[in-house]
């Protein structure tokens, strides 16, 4: 697509957005051209909060399907569109409400903590929803002496266990992108770039390794933490150990820093399904509206509402 074609699509999208009083939300993993047209760019927590606060009549969520579903749970009176409704997530697809209910039978006093990367059905049987930005804080605040099930991300769960010392039963799910970011790869990059920090998302396999957690050159944190890090550090070189599309925003903010993706080709194929044409068509035809059964939505909202209290 030529730049002229891109600009024409931008103009069409802006016109449609104004006509329909719509707001465009995009995750940092979206294509750069999607990021540029978004009204709000953020990680899962930030976008969830924006979805609950916007005055727009329509929310167009440029993210995978569970993100659009979460926006609808938070803003039931808004029309929420997901340009690619079949854009999935290996984490969200890996957890089931049935599995959680089976665990509850064995642990009637247990607490279920679910990552935001889950379906509405899973959120509905969850006690606390979390994101990578607030998971540590929420788990630390849970009452002691009660069993905890954390899911679906086993790597994030193990990282939380290592940092907090809380024992948890872990669902064995994983993000296929971050599953390739191993301890061995991180150690290789530490040796190759001795002046660099490695910024690691806690969904990564490496984040579950205590030697990585304890290494002062390894900064483990949410997408927003990773993106903000070069702005609060004097170092010039950073290895980015997460989905590489975050470099679009990081490069824009920190043009004087050297930002090196740990796996430049390991991208989220689901996020890349969302294109400018698909965004334009979603607005034009108001298609792919997200619907959540009201009884299910109310149950799912409870776990999200508890998250917002932290």
Please provide the spans of the model-predicted regions:
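Active-site loop-to-helix "anion-binding N-cap" substructures in soluble metabolic enzymes
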Residues: 1-240, 246-310
């Amino acid at each position: 697509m030529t730049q002229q074609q891109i600009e024409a699509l931008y103009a069409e999208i802006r016109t449609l957005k104004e006509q329909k009083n719509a707001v465009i939300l995009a995750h940092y993993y979206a294509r750069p051209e999607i990021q540029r047209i978004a009204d709000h760019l953020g990680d899962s927590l930030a976008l969830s909060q924006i979805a609950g606060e916007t005055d727009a009549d329509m929310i167009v969520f440029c993210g995978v399907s569970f993100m659009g579903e979460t926006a609808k749970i938070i803003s039931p009176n808004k029309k929420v569109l997901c340009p690619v409704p079949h854009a999935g997530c290996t984490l969200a697809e890996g957890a089931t409400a049935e599995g959680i209910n089976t665990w509850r039978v064995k642990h009637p006093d247990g607490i279920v903590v679910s990552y935001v990367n889950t379906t509405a059905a899973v959120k509905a049987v969850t006690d606390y929803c979390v994101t990578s930005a607030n998971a540590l804080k929420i788990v630390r605040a849970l009452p002691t002496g009660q069993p905890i099930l954390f899911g679906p991300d086993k790597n994030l769960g193990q990282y939380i266990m290592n940092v907090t010392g809380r024992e948890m039963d872990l669902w064995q799910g994983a993000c296929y992108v971050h599953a390739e970011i191993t301890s061995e790869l991180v150690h290789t990059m530490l040796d190759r770039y001795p002046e660099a920090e490695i910024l690691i998302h806690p969904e990564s396999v490496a984040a579950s390794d205590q030697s990585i957690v304890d290494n002062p050159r390894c900064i483990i944190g949410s997408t927003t933490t990773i993106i903000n890090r070069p702005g609060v550090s004097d170092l010039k070189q950073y290895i980015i150990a997460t989905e590489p599309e975050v470099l679009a925003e990081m490069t824009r903010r920190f043009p004087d820093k050297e930002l090196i993706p740990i796996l430049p080709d390991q991208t989220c194929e689901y996020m890349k399904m969302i294109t400018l044409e698909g965004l334009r068509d979603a607005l034009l035809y108001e298609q792919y509206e997200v619907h959540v059964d009201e009884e299910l939505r109310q149950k799912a909202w409870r776990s999200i509402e508890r998250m917002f209290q932290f």
